[in-house]
Design a protein with these regions (language model features):
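Short beta-strand scaffold segments in enzyme catalytic cores
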Residues: 22-26, 150-155
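General beta-strand structural signal in soluble alpha/beta enzymes
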Residues: 116-120
């Protein structure tokens, strides 16, 4: 492997492994992206093939940045699914079928010739916000990402919190509904936050409003849909146009999310919670996005201890689709720095 101990201005590579694509970014020590490369995951070919192509993308990104492997101190790899971080293995990644118990960290190190830091994609995204994003300087940061599911990453005192069994931050499976008719989560349990505050939850509730014949401009669009995952965008567009049912769904989603946040706040006492992911209804740039955040704030602050409500910052994340690879590179940088101190 490359010897990084003598690098004056080290560079780092971040890899974001997804079910569809692998994103690779080469970053300098300040967190600036020098080059960016993507390659399809091609899950069906298996983890060995994907890891070899991942390593090729890492080396391609290094060359594209005008560097050599000797200029890179370390690679960071962020992965979805159930992981065993100490051993660097995928355990049961739900969106990577057939990849169970694959030692991906060591394989990437072998194929790239560079040392590798391994992390869950949620904490990696949170670390990106802490390092160069909206969470800079925060002592306790929680990032909640809203998409098909609800992801989470926690950064405490500058370090990601992975938990004892590499499961820390699975806030999407916090219980928010104990009723007999609680919604099913895709994990097979009822009443989890993810079943209510994710894009899937929004789609399911919207369908119910349409089937109950509420008066809404969503009706024709929802009935004509090709896929359920088109519905959250419809809700956003109709909410922007002032549709009352669409706005109701947005506010419901905000309240459900806040209910999941409350237990996190009282347990962890963060200084900041950031909301990111694909389903933020346009963020601060749109009226609906502002209503969404305002509703989250109002519901949350009204239900937590007053001294926390007065101090907690709730805001949108800013790193977007770059968060995964940037955070992975940042974690690689942190590991490298700590190794230098130890020497």
């Amino acid at each position: 492997m490359a010897n990084s101990s003598n690098l004056k201005k080290p560079n780092f590579v971040g890899v974001d492994l997804g079910g569809t694509n692998i994103k690779v970014g080469v970053l300098d020590d300040a967190g600036k992206t020098l080059s960016y490369v993507t390659t399809p995951t091609l899950v069906e070919r298996g983890p060995e093939d994907a890891t070899k192509r991942m390593a090729e993308a890492v080396l391609q990104g290094i060359e594209k940045a005008g560097l050599t492997p000797a200029d890179v101190a370390r690679v960071g790899l962020g992965s979805p699914g159930t992981l065993d971080i100490p051993t660097g293995s995928l355990v049961r990644p739900s969106n990577l079928p057939g990849w169970n118990f694959f030692p991906i960290r060591d394989k990437l190190a072998e194929y790239s010739g560079l040392p590798v830091t391994f992390a869950h994609d949620g904490p990696a995204a949170a670390f990106a916000e802490y390092w160069v994003g909206a969470g800079q300087g925060e002592e306790g940061l929680i990032l909640l990402t809203l998409g098909t599911g609800v992801g989470c990453g926690i950064v405490l005192n500058g370090h990601v919190w992975n938990g004892t069994h590499s499961h820390g931050g699975e806030a999407g499976h916090n219980l928010i509904d104990t009723s007999e008719n609680a919604r099913w989560c895709k994990c097979g349990q009822r009443g989890h936050l993810e079943a209510y505050a994710s894009a899937t939850g929004v789609a399911n509730r919207t369908i119910e409003y349409v089937e109950a014949e509420f008066k809404t401009s969503l009706t024709e669009r929802v009935r004509a849909r090709k896929r359920d995952d088109e519905i959250p965008k419809m809700v956003f567009e109709e909410a922007e146009a002032g549709d009352e049912v669409a706005l109701r769904i947005v506010k419901e989603t905000a309240r459900y999310l806040s209910h999941g946040m409350i237990s996190l706040i009282h347990t962890i006492d963060p200084s900041c919670i950031l909301i990111g992911g694909a389903m933020t209804f346009g963020g601060k740039t749109t009226a609906t996005g502002r209503i969404f955040l305002e509703t989250i704030e109002q519901e949350t602050r009204s239900r937590i201890f007053l001294h926390l409500a007065e101090r907690l910052r709730i805001d949108y994340a800013v790193m977007g689709n770059d968060a995964g690879y940037v955070g992975a590179a940042g974690l690689a940088r942190q590991d490298w720095e700590e190794a230098q101190i130890a020497e």
